[in-house]
Amino acid sequence: MPIIGPWRKLKEKGLALDAKFDIRMPDTWTVIFDLSNTEKVKNSLKRADEEITELKASLSEKKKGKEMDFTVPEFVGRVLKKIYDGKMRKTKNLSVSDACIGCTLCAKKCPFQAIEMQNKKPVWVKEDCTMCLGCLHRCPTHAIYYGNGKATNAHGQYTYQKYAGEKSV
């Protein structure tokens, strides 16, 4: 399997990667993935906690090896990245409904600073963003959606704090 991503950069610099690990977490990209079943999400987080415990032990023991379950051929990764970067990361895919209460959580928490509040509503001021959907997941009234909203509205919201029993921010 060809080396992709940051591992290729290490190899180009003459550095070796001794180990890599995979921790499966709930995928929060609700354009595709469904997080509406809270029990499934809780089970996924429980498995992740177990994997983290195993990972800590492996790191303590300085184990070497490839512990990742998921890899894709390089050409598939390039095609998916081109689609994602070319169309899916465009902020024009994000919209806000009249349910917006102007709380500003979306703008305050956007890691890309792609959102500004105008007339108490979010406006995406950058053409692209990381499309983390943090704005969508934090909106207390579910007013932010991707595309036509059918998938993201039906697939639920996720913040780790919600499942960790902490205040969601």
Region locations from a protein language model:
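A mid-sequence, solvent-exposed acidic-amphipathic segment
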Residues: 71-104, 108-111
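Long, positively charged, glycine-interspersed low-complexity recognition regions
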Residues: 142-169
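Short amphipathic alpha-helical segments at helix-loop
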Residues: 36-40, 88, 92, 121
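FMN-binding flavodoxin-like domain, especially the glycine-rich phosphate-binding loop
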Residues: 1-83, 154
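Iron-sulfur cluster-binding cysteine motifs and their immediate structural context
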Residues: 96, 105-124, 134-151
